[in-house]
Structures are given as structure tokens and as C-alpha cells.
């Protein structure tokens, strides 16, 4: 059965007619604002090389763990979905993999994935019928053709999407060659990097030792000495800032921070290098490094992002065969009040530091995060993240944080995605949900419509620019 | 004051007129579907013997901890409510107990109990005025009379309620005589059992040793040896399957699982039998047994249900005098991410195993359970349970699980009740709430109405049949 | 830009027209009921001395941590906001501080603070334009003038606000002189005290030793002996009851209770006095004292309130400079099920005891608190507290507790404030939110409108009077 694909202009607005009218007006003032994407995981090589994307499966399905984890949960093997394993590329025929997705679209009913996909199918590729078993081949063929045309190259899409700024995320061991190539090419698209040092901080990461060696090579520092190790961080941060970075990012299992003496920090570092360390040692080192990163941020001005609370690689069998980031990362209960205290005791009242905190544990929104951000000058709240980057998730974020932290201790939207084509769809969802939330406040006479308009624009555009220091004169020439 | 009793046809639908219209249409397509009740606690003797229920108090009040715990919380002694104690039957006159309920109906405003009761009073008994102090006797008399008529016998009600299948829950030490008698009687009602081995697994259960003896007698196994004990489980599972069982059920204090070596499991079992064991030993044994049950399910195909997180018998004084299941079980914070890992590491990627997980800790819906069920092939989410089997509770379940797990990693509704007459009321509430939730998605243009119709039918009928393997050809002849 | 200030008559009601009509009717029956304020932190000296309040900054901003913490979170130093430090009064000019607030009102969009302020500005001071940078001086001047007039003295406002009863909160070491003076003055306003013994119970409180000495002086007891210490509590409780107290209040870091033997309690007390104690000792002592307080309540009839779960003075630097209660108290995850068990095992089934429990951890509403209060005769649920005393917070409280605990295990509203002028605003918000919640139940046909009217009046007026024993014949002459 073939069904029409329609992106209703009122989608995601509250159903009540009066509230919807207000939402429509608020959304009208933000829908065409440029996209600021200050945190995400697109591949800089796309913009450096500007090569065409290969086909629908390799564009949409194989890299998107939101999609293939859902199919996997219903018993479809990853090998049939185009997902590469440690042994090499997937044995699946891309067209067959695409058909598998197409015939299981009912699994995504009520999920953000279906909204994002339909947005892309309708807005970017112009489809007017839904993806289904019947239309799988039509989709696969038309998408394949389109991708060969110049209008669907990464840079062309970047411009078409009205992206004012896009940040990627790299490891300190990345030589930033794609960012350099982009700049050398003279292309005007503003793509910057962000400093994510987890591989050289997390001693439990499978690549820790190899990353550390590479870290030493790139910086010429003795990274087996504590002072050399810290100096290497300073150098790579500076190098990242030359490629436009205004932020760092830290994806630790918990939000723990520590504030050890120099001697204790040094001894701990030596212990980690000896490889004779416990999980508690590794945790304490990650905790200490957040405080070290904060100290460096006070010097160089980089905004810190903390993304804690994911139990990575939960599925042992899958990890052994397919490696990381395969949809098997599961959120855990996360404490902030005790975890952040050492860092806050040291730097919480600094006005020159900015730390953006995220959570996968919504129970902390009203209980911990809004009260912390509503008090400490250094703290801001990142938007609803990952599993919660969804209509209901975003609504809960606003409902549970606004009354204590207000809107102005939040930082606007992050798409946080490597699904490049979904970026406009994701920002559009955020703008619609914020418009709907503000519209409810207006309809309940808790906020004037004038104030709501101003706030809507701030959430969509001004707050991310300010929070990520994107409108400040850059400290390094290259960031302009 | 006497007030009319009205069951409004639009009850529980969202108030917004447009959304309500959609909900009405969706509900229309499911309201008359047969009831599938794959998990509950009705007494098989009712259907085996088909004896009349005694009176209103003994039918509604004395066995329903939802009702008497609320009266108890306001200072009414259980002895006045018909609730039996360990010393014997209640000293209360049933009519007096009924009057006590009737004159306190305001306590139930806004609770599901009042909706369930009113549904039964109106739909099953035809009352058109509300229960109150003034109408207490009228109710007591009319219900008493009705219960003597053939139309109110258990089997007649079963048929009138349009129940396609009803599962009861029995201990391994139950000889299943009522199920056997039912089958022998030639009655066509499909009532099956389910295997709930807690009394022979939980060494802290007050009947553990006695249950174990009985377990040995029934199976002829040496249940004091580890292999004999496991073999006894296999034999009782097979016997339960002969009485139609398609599932097991496990009501542990936590969701902990373990995967011990054979030697360690055996040693632990011996320790428990020595009675010289710690609470941690008992917990580890329950954890190990979940993994053992999963292993057996891979062989015999029974679906596992895990109902963790209730702190049983919290009120020490009440437990001493009245025993278990007296409304004093309190939910606790429950971890799933670490707890389930040992079992999932062993069997999480099996396609021949199905584990349905429940929770009393709603904070785990979006954080842990939806991400786990949205990834692992073996996991499905049971519906909102116990305290959360209520309009707001069900809404939160859908709002917090759908965006990550979708609808198709859930299993439809369980009434989980021993209040037989409330079964249609409870399924009706679930169908109305799901219709309302789907209607909101349609009204917000997040789902087409066609897809919503299909999903509504799946939630009400197809998913429970599939999840509990009720439409599969049975592996044992008796289950047909 | 100057904008009109309007308090819309329908504010906070649900947007749906039909539901709003019902809410309007329900609110109509409660809006003019007298205010019962059984728990709060106003200063009894205001009513004893009836001196005029000084100016807008000292009335609104400097004492209100909701306001200045938000400004502080955005980088405004407390010294610029009129907040006194340990070193003495604030160096800020009150008018300058007021301008700082006025020009940052956008920070409060969507927060209850903005609703409360606007209510006071509009209803109490008659402003018809919003506070902003442009109107800061106008506001400061007009408020300053008004405060000098007799109509704005504390007692006149008390009467204008239609307050039937107001409870303040004092330490056992307070000599209650202001309460005595009030009574001696012949003023008819009913202002009573409440017994908050934290400073003589919490050995980690910075004033513990000094408070203990004062406690001994006031009572003439040897408070370094366990029996003398307990006797001193009994005496101060009696003295508080003479000043109208009907309740005690306990603000511990957790909800832990204990039930030690006499010998163990005595030994623990000696250890605390030796000053050679661990945090765990201090915690155990607080836990034991809750049980001791319950035992005394059984004798003297005082209602217990437990307000647990705040991590006090989280910001070490701020605490060192400005002291306690400066907006740096952060909620923590709070367990009730295990924490309350020792007290409940001892006294949970008493009908002569009443314990009102509060939480800052909303995840405990549906999981722990509603099930506990829906079972134990001694337990009632306090209203949404502190960070959750807000429109969304109150809604969540009702949505998450009503289905299990009903309305009648809750105790109506507490304003819990030291912002005297905001008391009518806060009660008005609570009445509107409850009207809106009840209206939704009526609109969804879950409650009749007659029952909703009765319930609305109970929540606004009857339940607080009953729960705090304000309509019982007093046991002491002074309480009448």
C-alpha cells in the first residue's frame, strides 16, 4: 500500500487551536534563522573533499545507530543492514539492506527517527509518497541518482541548509588535516573543530596507549611526564583553536570531578601509565582531568562541555564483533551534586569559565541540574541529549528546567549528529517544540507574547552563539 | 446525597475537541476486540468450580489491597474491612465493612480504583446511582442477589467479558488441580497457567524450605542437589506447559542477574540449603536463577517475565499479624543497566529467547528500559505496572518509552489482577489511554491516522498474542 | 520599552476552552477563602513590632534567594544586590541594586518568581506597567512611598491578605519574645510558631555547640546527659505550644531514621558531645532524633514535618563569605523506603501520630511517597516544595501522587516563604493549579464536577486545617 508523504506545516505544535495559533506565530519568527550547530559529529572529510555520498543505505542506514539498533532489537542481524564489522565491510547488498529498512518502517512510528527521515525525504529529496516495502526501490534509485548530482554534494547541501556554523569533534590525536584542507580550499562554509580528549584521558579506552603515543608524537612532548602531558594538552588545544575550536567536550561514564594536589595527580598519572591500575584509579584520573581542563579553559577561553552518564558498549558480544558506537550505549543514573563539587569548589564562581552540562538521566533536570545552573556562574545546561533529543524529551527538558534555571541558563539546541542530512530536520524539531512550549506559557498567561518572541529567537540563534562564544572576536586569527 | 453514576462514552480521552474526535475513532476500532490477559492473579478454582461469589465485601473489598490500603491509610483498621488475618477470618460483618467503604468513596477521587469500581457497578451490575453512605445497603443487597444468579457465575462472566485467553499464575508446588479440572470439564474458556517459581528460588521467603520439600515430592527429584533442583524446574515447567503455560514470572526484589560457573552455582546452592547464608547470598542465588531460567527458556520456549523492585511486606507489624500482600509493598529505585548485564552478556543476542521486563521505577523508562529494549533482541517492555497501571501512569509509560523503543518493543496490556470483575474495566482504560496517546500524535502530525489505527489494534490485540506466543502452534498438545 | 502589566484572570488555567471553563468555576469557589499558612519562614518581629519595611530592595531582593541566585548565576556579584555578607551589610546602594534586578527581568521568564513579583506589583502596589530598566526608578520610588503608609505595615497587610493563620519557624534556642510580644499586644492576627530543632540535633551544624549551651540555659536541664537533653526538648516543645505551635519541622540532609536501644542512643550522644565523631555518627544521631521526636509527638500531639534531601551550602566559597541560605542549597536524590522504615516499624501504625513528608526528589512521588502515604496511617504528603513550588512542579505533584495516594493523604498548600508579600500570590498559584488539575479530571470524565468542587475547597482550606490540627481544641490555653 502506497501512502502520501506529507510534512504538515503545523506538525509538533500543540493541538489546542488557540495555543497552536500562538506557536505558529512564534515559529514564524525563527524558522528561517540560520542554523548554528556548535556540537556534532559530522565528518570533516565530507566538506574537505566534497565527494558525493554513495547510496541511500550508506548515507542513511549504515551509519545511523538510531535506525539499525531498532531493527536489531527486532531480530534483524546487523550484517543485513550494511553495518561494517571489525572484520571489514558489511556483506549486505545496499539495495537489500534498504529494503529491510523500508519494510520495517512501522517500528519507527512515534519516534524522532521517522520524523527526521520523512523531513529529509520530503524536503531534501522531494518525495511525496512514504517509504515502504512497495516504494523501497523507487527511493533507493532516486536517492542514488540525486546523490550523483552537484546539488547533493556536502558543500552544496551545507549552503542549501543555511548553516552559519558547524562544529565537528576530533580527538587530540587527529592531525586536523581535513580542517586544514577546508581552509586552504577557500570555501566559505564555516566548519570548526572541537577538542575531545577522551582517548588520551580514559585509561580504560581500548586505544589509550596508542593514542598517548600519537599524542606525544604530534606535540613533541614527553607525555609520560605529568607536566609534559599537560603541556601536550595545552598545545593541542591551541592547535584546535587555530582550526576554529571554541569548545572542548568530555564524554565520561560519570560526572565525577576531583581536585587533587599536584603530587597526588602526578602519582596517579604514573600509576595509570604502569597499567597496574584499578577502575577506581581510571575514574579518579578522568575526574581530575575535568578540573585540569577547566583550569586550561580559564587560560585559553575554550568552553567546556560535559556529556556524562553513558554506559558504553553494553552489549559485550556485539562490541567484540562490531566495535564501538553500535547502538549499545545505555544511559545510567547520574549524580551531579556530589560529582561536580570538587570542580565547582575550585572554579565555580569564576566569571571567565563556562561549563555546559548534559545529562541522559532526566530525573536530574529539576532535582540537580536546574538548581546548579540557576546558581553557579560557570554552569549552563546543554539541551536534551541523545535519547531525549525528541519531541517529548525536549518538552520535558523545558518543563523541568525552566522554572528554576530560566531560559537564559540554557544554550539553545545541539543536533549532536553525524547524520548530516538530518541537521535541518533536527533544528526544525527543536524550534517547533520550543515554539510550542512558549506558546503554552503565553496561552496560560504566564508570559507575554512579545517576551515569547524574543525568547524564541534567543533560543534558536542568540544563546548558542553566546554560549559557545561564536560571536566573540576570536583569540586566534584562523577562527574569524 | 445520591448522585447519578454515569460512564461517559468519552471518558479518559484528551479534552481538546479535535484530538478527542481522533481518539474516539481509534478507540472505536479496538473497544470490542476480545480480551487477551496473558498475566494475572485470578484464582483458577473460580473457573474450575464455577461457584457463585459470596457477597459484595468478599468480592470487591476484602481481596483488593488497592481499596483497603487506602482506607487503612486514613486510620480504618483492616479488621473492620473484612480482611482476614493470620488468626483467621475477619470479625467484621460484611455489610458493615461495605458501609465503611461506601462512606469513604471520596478517598478514591482521582484514583483508578474509582474508575474500575464504577465501571463494574455500571456495566456489570447496572447501577445508575453512585455508591455512597446512602446507597451502601442498596448496593450490598443488589450485588448479593445478582451473585446468586447463573449469569454472575465465574464462567458466565468470563464469556460475557469476551475474554479470549486468561493466564493465572501458580507456584511450582501447585499441583494444578484446578487447571486440570477445568480441562476435564470440557469448558471452552481458555484459561492457562504461568510458572512463578519465587517460593522455591527465594531463600528469604518464609515458606522456602517447605516449598522446596513439596517441590521434591512433586517431581521425585533430589532437589537438594543442584542438578536435581534444576531438573525439577524443567519437569514443573513441562507440567505447566501441559496446562497451557507460555510464560514464567519472577518477582524479585531487584533485577539482578548473575552468570556463575557451575561450581560456584552449586556451592552457593549448598550454602543456601545449609541455612547459614547472608542476604547477599540469597540475592546472588535469585540473580543466578534468572539466568538459569533464561537457559531453560531457550530450550522449552517459555517467555520470561521479570517484575522487580518491590520492597515486600514493608510494614513489619502488619506483616506479623496479616501476612503478605496486604497493600504494604512499596516500590524502590531499581537499576537495570548493571543488573541485567550478566544475563544479557550470556543470552542478550539470542533470537529464540524473549524476556519481558517491568518496572515500578518510572525514572528508568526513558533512561534505561527503552534504550535496552530498543537494542537487545531478547528484551521487550511490559506495560505500566501496579501503582502505574492508571491513566497518568500509562500516559507516562508511552510518553517516556515510545520515542526510543517504539511501540513494537512493548507487549500490549496486562491487567495483572486478582479482581476478576475489573478485568474488562482495566483493559478498557488501557485501550482508551492508548487511543488518546495515539490521537495526540495524529493531532500533532507525528503519525498518520491510518498508522495509528493499525497501531491501536496491535497494542490491544496482536502484540500481546505475539509477545506471549499465544498464536504459535503450541509445543505441547494441551495448549491448543 | 514600557509594557503593560496585566494579571490575566485566567492565568495558569489549561488552554483548552472547555477545561478552562471548568477551572474557572472551580477556582471561583476557592479564590476568596482565607489563607491558611501552616508552614513558613516569615519573621515574627514584623508582626510584633509592626515597623514599616524599608525599601523595595530590602523588601524584595536582598532577602529572596530565588531572585538573587538567578542574577548571580548570570555573573552579577551578590555585593551589588544588597545581600549582606558575614562582614556586614551590603555595600550596594539599594536603588542601584533594584535597577540591576529591573534590567534583568528577562532571566525570570517562565519562572514562578516572575509570577509572584507581578502579582505583588499589580495587586498589592497597583502597578499597571512592567518592571524594566525604564521603570526601575518609578517602581523604587512608588514602593518606597507606599511602605511608609500605614496600609503597608505588616499587620495591615496581614489583615488585607485575609490570612486566618500564619506559622513561623523557630529554633529551640529562640526565646519566642516576638511571639510573646504579639500576644501581649492584643493584636488579633493569628501567628503561631513551629518547633525546628535542627541546630541542637545536627552536630555538623556550625552553631551546634553554641546552640546546645543556649538550649541548656533556657531549660535549666543538663543537656549533656541524654535524659536531660530529651527533657529539654520536651520543655521547649511545651513552650512552643504555648505560643500556638501545632507542629515540628526537621530539615535533615536525608530522610534516615533509626530506632536505637537506649544504651546505644546514649552512647552515640556522648560521642557527638566529645566532638570526636564521624559524619556517619552525626547522620545516625539525626536519624535517631526523628524517632525520638515521633515518640514525643505521640505524647504532646505535635505534627511532625520532615523536609529532607537538600545539600546545604553547596558553594564553599560563597558559604565562607556570605553564610547559609544564599541560594546555594541543591536537592539530592532521596530514598524514603529504607530511610523511614525504622521509624515506621516503631510508630507507623499509630493513629495518634501524624508525619508530613516532603521531597525535593520528584522521582520519589509515584515510586515511594504516594505508596507509603497510601498505606501508612501516620504518613501524609506535604505539597510540592521549594524548587517544585511552581506551576509545572505542582502539576507533576498531583499527576504523580493522586492516583496512588488520592487527594486526602495530602495536606493542602504550604507557602514556606519568608517573602511575606508573596504569600497571597503563592496561595493563588496553588489554587489555580489545583483548579486546573481537577478541571482536567472533570473534562476527561474521571471526576464529577460536584466532587471536584468539594475537593478544591478541601485542598485550599479544610485539609491544611485538619492536617496541622488547626481546628482541634488546643491542648494548651494559648493556642486558642
From Swiss-Prot, chains A, B, C:
UniProt xrefs under InterPro entries: Metal_Hydrolase, Uronate_isomerase
Homology family: Belongs to the metallo-dependent hydrolases superfamily. Uronate isomerase family.
Keyword terms: Isomerase
NCBIfam families: PRK02925.1
A biological process from GO: D-glucuronate catabolic process
Pfam families: UxaC
Identification of the protein by name: Uronate isomerase
Catalytic activity: D-glucuronate = D-fructuronate; aldehydo-D-galacturonate = keto-D-tagaturonate
Domain of life: Bacteria
GO molecular function, one term: glucuronate isomerase activity
Pathway: Carbohydrate metabolism; pentose and glucuronate interconversion
Keyword Isomerase: yes
Membrane-crossing segments per the record: none
PANTHER family referenced in this protein's UniProt entry, alphabetically: URONATE ISOMERASE
E.C. code: 5.3.1.12
